[in-house]
């Protein structure tokens, strides 16, 4: 998983710099994961490796697509997790997502505390939760999020995805 980890570091650096994970990183990551799974995974026929890889890609997309649909995340972050899924299949994608969510939460809290804007962002958090529960139209939620974006602190989510996933890989012994 060294290739995936190196790709994640590059994506995180670019996301931190430009607030964007470019397609020239995510699409090759997805396709190379499919190719790797179809040709290099021992113990599986090519079609089964490819099937698990595509399933992992779909799980990665499904986990972050709702946040993207309501304007809470960029498409590059969604495709980055899909790329992870292409390489490590569905089960490890779930664990990488969980680790990334924990890291993202910690970073978000630290950012708010560092700027000393806890109460402002706490009230925005509850307002967003209320909107998600009451406004059922994803397009309206995305429009509301776009209006609010200039007042929000932005977290380039490629960073927590990279940190969380690499920490998970290390803990699971996948970097050996």
PLM features per residue range, with description:
Residues 1-176:
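A membrane-topology feature that recognizes alpha-helical transmembrane segments
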